[in-house]
Curated annotation (Swiss-Prot):
The gene is PDCD4. Polyubiquitinated, leading to its proteasomal degradation. Rapidly degraded in response to mitogens. Phosphorylation of the phosphodegron promotes interaction with BTRC and proteasomal degradation. Phosphorylated at Ser-67 by RPS6KB1 in response to mitogens; phosphorylation promotes proteasomal degradation of PDCD4. Changing residue 249 to A: Reduced interaction with EIF4A1. A motif (Nuclear localization signal) lies at residues 58-64, 241-250. It comes from Homo sapiens. Changing residue 457 to A: Loss of phosphorylation site, and loss of nuclear accumulation. Abolishes phosphorylation by PKB. One of its GO terms (molecular function) is RNA binding. The lineage of its organism: Eukaryota, Metazoa, Chordata, Craniata, Vertebrata. This is Programmed cell death protein 4. Changing residue 210 to A: Reduced inhibition of EIF4A1 helicase activity. Strongly reduced inhibition of translation. Its main location: nucleus.
Amino acid sequence: MDVENEQILNVNPADPDNLSDSLFSGDEENAGTEEIKNEINGNWISASSINEARINAKAKRRLRKNSSRDSGRGDSVSDSGSDALRSGLTVPTSPKGRLLDRRSRSGKGRGLPKKGGAGGKGVWGTPGQVYDVEEVDVKDPNYDDDQENCVYETVVLPLDERAFEKTLTPIIQEYFEHGDTNEVAEMLRDLNLGEMKSGVPVLAVSLALEGKASHREMTSKLLSDLCGTVMSTTDVEKSFDKLLKDLPELALDTPRAPQLVGQFIARAVGDGILCNTYIDSYKGTVDCVQARAALDKATVLLSMSKGGKRKDSVWGSGGGQQSVNHLVKEIDMLLKEYLLSGDISEAEHCLKELEVPHFHHELVYEAIIMVLESTGESTFKMILDLLKSLWKSSTITVDQMKRGYERIYNEIPDINLDVPHSYSVLERFVEECFQAGIISKQLRDLCPSRGRKRFVSEGDGGRLKPESY
């Protein structure tokens, strides 16, 4: 009945103000109104009581809904709830009052883990918390007793022949740059060489044959350091057996391969990584001409070492390890051999073999000294052709050429004491070099010239001095 009464009141609200416009008036109107209200209520409950009950119920619902949200506010709804109930009015809850409130409006939070909590949602636990060891269930259908004492280890597959050459070639080429044998040994230990250990000396020697003398010296040192750590003496013997077998193919790319391999064998015997009877084991059993030449070269070097020559000097000392006096002698011999043979390409090759590009100014200096001390035109022309060829091939750089000429310019007064006509010869040679494009105009203009000596009787301007007595 209450629900039906509320629906009827919603459709036809019994407002006393609105009933004032009815057709009845006076006491009849009031009596009719009270009779209608009593009929509508049914239970003889006044309409004002129903309206007041509805307002109070609505205020209670709002109070329960907002109690959790506004629990932290200073002026909560509960403080004013009793006043609202007593007055019959609702307290408006505008969203503007919660504009800067960072708390969740649903009252449940965002579901994030606790900050600094121990064991909350998404947290591993307190620092230092030890978890229990997971015990294996023996009755588990998937239980395997072999897994209890199982030790796992990283397995590196052995290298095949193609991967071996592709992997080790950059390692050896980088070694020629830094020269650190320990780094190469560490990198080789990380690889599973397997049966390819004997291929390390073969590949290193093959690359050194195409390089310089310093590279061959570094290769001999590398083989000596790797023997005993990465490979054994047996692996070294197998590698040199393969080198002697492959000498015909190596000689196609490097004609001097037989002599160089013989030097490698002699150095290996001297370092103790090859036995002394290695060469004797090949006597009378070698049919290859190149292999026989290599063994003969090694035999000669070993016999020389018995007479006092060190076996570690088979490659010489290359690059900056050579002394200045030794380099000066080598350059002087190079120029003298060139003047005898006239072979410019051989002279250029010998200069590159010295591996001292920072010392090429010495060749320019010694060559010009030979021109100044010569008496014929052949030396003048041959030295000019040599410097021109070295300049065009960029064997001698601009700085080295300039430094060699400047040394001559600074020492020409002392040279002139031993060579009287050195000034005139130098001026002529410098002019020819400028015409050939060897030196620049600025360097030519720096050439010193010696003026004509005046006689005692000549004064300034060539006039005779007046008698002063």
